[in-house]
C-alpha cells in the first residue's frame, strides 16, 4: 500500500515543533499520535493524497485540499521524506498555540453529540486531538505514537539538521531545496501534480 501525509512544522521561541494528531478511541489497529495521512486512492497522485488526507484528518481546520495546497505554496513548499511506501510532506506553518485547543474542543463537542457509528464510518474525526511536539518530546515520548510511526520519528531525528535548514530557508524563500535522499523537494510554484 502506498500512503502519503502532511506534517506541519513550526518554530516557536527558537524551538522546532511538529503538529501531530492522535487517533480516535474507535481506532483498533494502532492507537497514538501520527501525522495526517492515508492511502493513495486509485488514480490519485501521492501529493494530492497528502493534501486530501491532511484536510480530512484535520477536519478542515486548515481548509479543504485546495486550501492546504495553497497554504503550503504560500509558506514556501515541502520537505519530503519517504519510509518504505509512506511519503511525508513536511511544511512550515506559523505557530498557533490555540489550534490544538480549538481542534480538540471541537472534536470533543461533536464526538459527544453525534452517532458513534456515523463517526466511525466517516472520513472525518479520525483524530481526536492534535498537539505540538518539540524535538525533545519526539525523543522522550515515542511511546505516545502509533507503533508504525516510531521508525518515522527516528527518521525525523536523524534528519533534523536538514529539516531545520529547510524550515529556515522556507521562512524566507520559495527555492527548491534537496531532501535527505539527495532528490529535490519541489515547491508547488515549480511543480504540478505529485
Regions found by a protein language model. Give the residues of each.
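N-terminal strand-loop-strand
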Residues: 1-35
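Acidic, glycine-rich loop-and-strand cores that form catalytic or ligand-binding grooves
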Residues: 63-115
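Extracellular/periplasmic catalytic domains that process cell-envelope and extracellular macromolecules
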Residues: 12-13, 27, 80-83, 123-125
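Nudix hydrolase/Nudix homology domain
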Residues: 27-32, 88, 98-194
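Short, well-ordered beta-strand micro-motif
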Residues: 8-10, 20, 90-94, 131-134
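Short beta-strand micro-motifs in enzyme catalytic cores
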Residues: 2, 17, 85-91, 129-131
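The catalytic Nudix box helix
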Residues: 35-75, 89
